[in-house]
């Protein structure tokens, strides 16, 4: 999407900074594009294992050739290429965090959550080439959002959409009718598949879409 491309291009201009994007705008997709265009070892810090799983799925979909490791709980197998790190695994007092210095880029997902003292200390002492923070809102009720620019850098780009993720649909009138007094789905499916006018309409829509893409 064009707004995603604009956000990626803007963020690539800076070595550090925050990307503000509402839910549904595809922050992970944009981050994957940034990873693809910066050929440096990258650590993605996420606040939960659930997000770690989502990141794994996104990386597998958009960057299938990239080696992905994970550092969370008992699962500590790093690839040194792109590694997903849970915040809890590096924010405890006894956590080993030296390995983070090997990365050229740190991406902090949901960066507004870095107010935890342990995680803040870890990130504040990192000396990396690129630091990217991503969040839907850079504000915290406890006032600790003032730390975000010190850790991730200033806000570099804000995605502003009236309705994030909006998709417009066109309804085509097929003139199909189903006269049976009882609704029996298998019979309805059969009748739909046999309707010549509807089938021709579908074929025309597909043909026009293919021509638009060519």
Where are these regions (language model features)?
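N-terminal pre-P-loop "Q-motif" helix
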Residues: 1-15
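Conserved interdomain hinge at the start of the Helicase C-terminal
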Residues: 34, 180-214
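Walker A/P-loop
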Residues: 13-35
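Conserved RecA-like ASCE P-loop NTPase motor core of nucleic-acid helicases/translocases
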Residues: 41-48, 213-214
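Conserved helix-turn-beta segment of the N-terminal RecA-like "Helicase ATP-binding" lobe
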Residues: 45, 49-74
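Conserved helix/coil segment N-terminal to the catalytic DExD/H
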Residues: 72-105, 116-121
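Post-DEXD/H (motif II) to motif III coupling segment of the RecA-like Helicase ATP-binding lobe
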Residues: 104-105, 112-170
